[in-house]
Amino acid sequence: MDEPGTLTAWIDTALAKIISDLGRARSLLKDAMSRLLETFTRLREQLLQERTLYEVTLQEVNGTAGDVGLVGVLRDVLSRCVDDMVRIGTSSVKIMMEVESLRGHTSKVAVRGQQIEKIASTTRMLSLNARIEAQRIGNAGAVFRVVADEIKSLANESGELSRAIREALAVQSASLAQTSTAVAKLASSDLDHAVTSNKKLDETIAKLAAMSARSLDIFARVQAETASALQALQFEDMLTQLLQSISDKLEIVRTACKAGAIDKLAELDRRIHRDVVTQHSLGVGTVELF
Amino acid sequence: MIQVTDNHDVVTIQLTGRFDFRVIKDFQELLTREPRTWVVDLSAVDYVDSSALGMLLLLRDRVRGDAQRVQLRGVHGQPREVLVMAKFDRMFKLE
């Protein structure tokens, strides 16, 4: 075989191999791009679902126009708790004041009882004197002696009754003092815990708001990146066409190398220089549609 | 501790330290008076409990809820936090 013939045969074989490789590359690229496109499309859908769920959760926590949300419920519970504590405090103060009034009345009654006991004691003394006088005047004083004894007996009974009342009042007074102590405990609820809880709630809401803003920002950025990736993957067609065009042009070169093609060189040259894709980047460009 | 200044038209109640159930008897006596205005000075008070709020509400009842007739002065620190949380700033004139 002559030398130009050997070279032509070698070039033809090499070109056939390159064209075959390009075909494989195109097929692999198409497959990889297709998978990437599927993955990013699913990612975009999941991101949308995730964002929707997140926004619903945020609404559940923060509330909407028609719903107070978890934060509103917590504030309401705390407010009701404080209202109840104030109500209990007010009622307890009223009870304590009533108990104090009762204790005052009890003391006054006890003083009156002591006065009655004093009167009974004086009456006893008077009846004793009357009895002595009745004794002194002999038989004529017998009737007075009986009256004096009756008065003494009444004074004793009155004194006993007063002592019993005084003792009962002492028991009542002690009981009122215990009531007052118990109600004082009820009246004096410490509201510091509620104040601290309220502050913590405010801090948590502020943190939650900051985290929400940051999360929504991240969501938006990831969504934008995904959209950008999806847009870039749509250039797969252009790349496939470009690879196909390279294969076609190599076929033209193969044809040009064959014997008798010298007359068709002008036509082949025109086909070689025709660009199906004018794009040099992922920006704006044109694709010649077949 | 409680100190009272009464000039008939205005009764000023000055409290010191803790404003709690221990001054209920003093308040009970005060509630028998009928001044035009009550001034409760809390500038030297560093703690209030629920009974203090109850006593203030009883003072308010005494003037039939007229917020202008019960003035709370010198409210600061814990007493202010508690009073604001219990919404007393809407029921009283807080200074």
Language-model features, listed with the residues they occupy:
Chain B
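Amphipathic alpha-helical interaction surfaces in cytosolic regulatory modules
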Residues: 21-91
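Short, conserved structural micro-motifs that define repeat-unit consensus positions
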Residues: 11-25
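Short beta-strand/loop segment at the start of cytosolic alpha/beta domains
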Residues: 1-14
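Short acidic-hydrophobic, aromatic-tinged amphipathic segments that line or gate anion-handling sites
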Residues: 93-95
